[in-house]
Amino acid sequence: MTATSSVKFIILTALLMSVSCKAGAQTIDSARLTAAAIREEQALKARIGVAVLDTASGLIQSYRGHERFPLNSTHKPLLCGVLLSNIDQGKFTLTEKIQFEKEKLVDYSPVTGKFVTPLSMDWQQLCSAAVAYSDNTAANLVAQKVGGPAAVNRFLAAIGDTTTRSDRFEPDLNSSLPGDERDTTTPEAISQTLYKLVLGDVLHSDSRQQLTQWMLDDKVADALLRSVLPPGWRIADKSGAGDYGSRSIISVVWPEKSSPLVIAVYITQTTATMTQSNEAIARIGQAIFSATKGKVN
């Protein structure tokens, strides 16, 4: 697929029911978005994908928006979305406690490592650990609870996402091999799915608020979009990282005086350091935020 910028209408029933498209609604500067992505792509010698869903107009704009990128830890809000959907159906509760042995721990488990048997954690704590702290063992426990990758894929397909795919558990899903479609998404697909989970009607109101809160509480993404967020704006996000220089973030951003944006940025196939990729994502975010501020009436 060629690296082109695309602008298209998204047919999302909940979106069209909840917002009106009218003259003067906020828009994103497509040329600036494309230029920012290409500039960072060339600087990092990377492949970069960006999508911005403007909920005021129902438009999504993207650069490499239909190309596949490694999910890495951006899959964790999806896992907890599936868990919350199960809770909405009465299958179990957030306060249900589980115990797990030390042998269950995998690399990067800053929270769960403190709660092995005889201690316990409930699902609220585990999703907080997975989303806000990117705890890998917590993510695996949630994935196992909902039925593994196959169940995640069934859920995604049921809400209209037949692109994003879950195949493995942490940490194996972070291999990020070029051309490997396992555990991948596209910037446009995951932006639409995140919209449905956080702003749509896929989850009950309480569950939407809970998922949003876990992402608002993100403790590991300060160097990315949060570092350039304008005063008075809010962000709920989840970052990811993997092999082949993969770095990513998905987010819902609430500007101070306009409707939310759903933003996804994915970087892969680069030898850049994580710091360099973080700075690149921040600069892309700055371009998006500046363009948005310039268009708001």
Mark where each language-model region is:
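Bacterial N-terminal signal peptides
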Residues: K8-S20
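Sec/Tat signal peptide C-region and signal peptidase I cleavage site
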Residues: C21-A25
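Structured C-terminal helix/loop/strand segments within mature extracytoplasmic catalytic/sensor domains
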Residues: Q26-E40, A56, Q144-K145, P149-A150, ...
